[in-house]
Amino acid sequence: MERTFVYLKPNAVRRGLVGEIIKRFEQRGIKIVALKLLWMSKQQAEKLYEMHKGKSFYNDLIDFVTGGPIVAMIVEAPRVIEMVRHIIGDTDPLKAGTGTIRGEFALTITKNLIHASDSKENFEREYKIFFSDDEIIDYYLDVQDDI
C-alpha cells in the first residue's frame, strides 16, 4: 500500500466542502489513516512551501494557508499518489477536468481548495510537518477485499 499527504485549504473548510471532498476519496477505496483539523502555523507553511520561497505568489500563499483552519490527512491505497492527483485535478482550476475537485469547486490557482503530495519523497517530507508516526492508525477497510 502507498500513502500520501493531503490537506484541505482554509477555503475548503470555510465553504463546507470537507465532507464532499473526503467522500470522493472514500468512494474510490482510499483509506484515511490520519486526520486532524488545525490552524497551520506560519512555520509549518514556510516549511511546506519552502521550494516556492522567492516566487511572486509565495507571501500570498503563506498568508492564505495560515488564514483559517485546515484539515490535514494521510491517506492510503494502491497507487494513491496518482489516484489522488487524478481526483483533485490540475492546480489551475481552468485546466482541471470536469468531475475533479478543483474543476468543480476551485476558484483560483492559489485558492484551489486542496494540496496533495506529488511524489513519495514529498509525502515523506510533508506529512512529518503535521503528523508524528504514532498518529497514523492502521486498520482494515472492508473495501480492501475488492482491491
Curated annotation (Swiss-Prot):
Its EC number is 2.7.4.6. It holds the Pfam family NDK. ATP binds at K9, F57, R85, T91, R102, N112. Keywords: ATP-binding, Cytoplasm, Kinase, Magnesium, Metal-binding, Nucleotide metabolism, Nucleotide-binding, Phosphoprotein, Transferase. GO terms for biological process: CTP biosynthetic process; GTP biosynthetic process; UTP biosynthetic process. Transmembrane segments: none annotated. It is an enzyme of class 2 (transferase). Its cofactor is Mg(2+). It comes from the Bacteria. Coiled coil: none annotated. It is found in: Cytoplasm. The active site is at H115. It catalyses: a 2'-deoxyribonucleoside 5'-diphosphate + ATP = a 2'-deoxyribonucleoside 5'-triphosphate + ADP; a ribonucleoside 5'-diphosphate + ATP = a ribonucleoside 5'-triphosphate + ADP. SUPFAM superfamilies: Nucleoside diphosphate kinase, NDK. Homotetramer. PANTHER family: NUCLEOSIDE DIPHOSPHATE KINASE. Major role in the synthesis of nucleoside triphosphates other than ATP. The ATP gamma phosphate is transferred to the NDP beta phosphate via a ping-pong mechanism, using a phosphorylated active-site intermediate. HAMAP family: NDP_kinase (MF_00451). Belongs to the NDK family. This is Nucleoside diphosphate kinase. The gene is ndk.
